[in-house]
């Protein structure tokens, strides 16, 4: 059944938003996996775990925001299966941050692709929504992860376990 509030909302935009919801849920699921990996008794980097748990929550909120906007515009939410994270073991903090950086770049590219669909279908509401709610935040996340990777390397990772401990205690502890 078609929505009575739908206006200037192309079916391609609606489908692309549903795919983006799935991407955000996948990112949330991946960050949740990372969080509980670093919370294990044999890893015990609790501030790193907390950081990844916060990232998971943020990605889930992004998915919910997209779904809310989909409903507001008169679109229909069609959820897909969420793929499991690419791995279960995340190695050291440097490896996990590098994986997180790649994930954020993938999410950012998906958002840019969604923006292009909105632009191609002349949907200023979608473009404004993405520009206001997502794009700047993605750039900030990518920069933050890049900074963390630089500092982890500076501390001697992956060879230096003490550097990983200090990063967890001081860098991640301060951002809590």
From Swiss-Prot:
Fe cation 1 binds at residues 24, 59, 62. The keyword Acyltransferase does not apply. GO terms for biological process: intracellular iron ion homeostasis; iron ion transport. GO terms for cellular component: cytoplasm. Fe cation binds at residue 58. Residues 7-156 form the Ferritin-like diiron domain. One of its GO terms (molecular function) is ferrous iron binding. Its EC number is 1.16.3.1. Fe cation 2 binds at residues 59, 104, 138. Signal peptide: none annotated. Keywords: Iron, Iron storage, Metal-binding, Oxidoreductase. It catalyses: 4 Fe(2+) + O2 + 4 H(+) = 4 Fe(3+) + 2 H2O. It comes from the Eukaryota. InterPro entries: Ferritin (IPR001519), Ferritin-like (IPR012347), Ferritin-like_diiron (IPR009040), Ferritin-like_SF (IPR009078), Ferritin_CS (IPR014034), Ferritin_DPS_dom (IPR008331). Stores iron in a soluble, non-toxic, readily available form. Important for iron homeostasis. Has ferroxidase activity. Iron is taken up in the ferrous form and deposited as ferric hydroxides after oxidation. Oligomer of 24 subunits. The functional molecule is roughly spherical and contains a central cavity into which the polymeric mineral iron core is deposited. There are three types of ferritin subunits in amphibia: L, M and H chains. M and H chains are fast mineralizing; the L chain is very slow mineralizing. Belongs to the ferritin family. PANTHER family: FERRITIN. This is Ferritin, higher subunit. The lineage of its organism: Eukaryota, Metazoa, Chordata, Craniata, Vertebrata.
């Amino acid at each position: 059944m078609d929505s009575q509030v739908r206006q200037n909302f192309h079916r391609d935009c609606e489908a692309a938003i549903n795919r983006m919801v799935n991407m955000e849920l996948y990112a949330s699921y991946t960050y949740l996996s990372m969080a509980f990996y670093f919370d294990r008794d044999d890893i015990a980097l609790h501030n790193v775990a907390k950081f990844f748990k916060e990232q998971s929550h943020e990605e889930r909120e992004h998915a919910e925001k997209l779904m809310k906007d989909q409903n507001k515009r008169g679109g229909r939410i069609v959820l897909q299966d969420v793929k499991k994270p690419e791995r279960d073991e995340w190695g050291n903090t440097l490896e996990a941050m590098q994986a997180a950086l790649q994930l954020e770049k993938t999410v950012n590219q998906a958002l840019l692709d969604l923006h292009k669909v909105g632009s191609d279908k002349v949907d200023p509401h979608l473009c404004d929504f993405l520009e206001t709610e997502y794009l700047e935040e993605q750039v900030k996340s990518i920069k933050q992860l890049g900074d963390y990777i630089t500092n982890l390397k500076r501390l001697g990772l992956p060879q230096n376990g003490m550097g990983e401990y200090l990063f967890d205690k001081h860098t991640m502890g301060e951002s809590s």
